Regions:
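Anionic coordination/interaction segments
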Residues: 1-143
Length: 143
């Protein structure tokens, strides 16, 4: 089964299916602050040391579940239905939910579309800083 490909022009690994056999992760960071993020926004953040300086709780024996993580939830106020900008943790049916993850050097972009709502979340650590940015863009394509 094909889960993605390398984009030579943009120097990114592009994951085209969110249901990978295990979490495919990327490292974001600076010397003082780091983060590990998977193709479904799972992972953790840490200051200086991934072993001793964790900021976001992460259970290494929970890797198969790829949780907790950096989840952005989206809700349709009319129907009450909700989903996440990354496939996990809600895991809507793949026949209806489209997703793409682009792991680049020091950034990850997760894009999705469900029920005519597009989302794109860029995750990165600004160079030399001790925080991470989650920049979200949500577009209703039905209007």
């Amino acid at each position: 089964m094909n889960y993605g490909h390398f984009d030579e022009q943009n120097k990114e690994y592009v994951i085209t299916r969110p249901d990978t056999p295990s979490a495919w992760a990327n490292y974001l960071g600076s010397p003082e602050y780091g983060a590990i993020i998977s193709n479904n926004a799972g992972g953790y953040s840490f200051e200086k040391s991934g072993a001793n300086g964790r900021i976001i709780r992460y259970r290494f024996n929970g890797v198969a579940n790829d949780q907790p993580g950096r989840y952005i939830y989206i809700k349709d106020n009319e129907s009450g239905e909700y989903w996440s900008g990354s496939w996990s943790p809600v895991c809507k049916p793949l026949e209806e939910y489209k997703s793409e993850c682009r792991h680049g050097t020091a950034y990850t972009i997760i894009s999705s579309e469900y029920k005519k709502i597009k989302s794109e979340v860029s995750y990165y650590v600004p160079q030399g800083q001790t925080y991470e940015v989650w920049a979200a863009k949500i577009t209703n394509t039905d209007s």
